[in-house]
Amino acid sequence: MLEKFRLAKEAEVRELLRLRDAGHVHAPWDRPRPGFGAALTRSESSGIIAEYKRASPSKGDINLGVTPAEACTGYARAGACALSILTESRYFKGDLSFLTE
């Protein structure tokens, strides 16, 4: 299954790297991002990483009526110290715009 994902994303990753190397920087990479490791190692950290995805290859659609911002706000309120937000579109119905919400 992982090889299937890798092959599906290979061309997209090449294009993103080409754009980056040409100096084209787009959101969410145009500003500093919180440190994932720092969130996990803070003394008051719960150590919980919450994952947001709109679909999965094995389960299909997952709660499409909730926006990424709503879901992630709920995860943070419930104690998550870090978020994993899937942006892969073909298999997980994600989008890079999820990272700017």
PLM-predicted stretches and their roles:
Residues 1-101:
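Conserved N-terminal beta1-alpha1 strand-loop-helix module at the mouth
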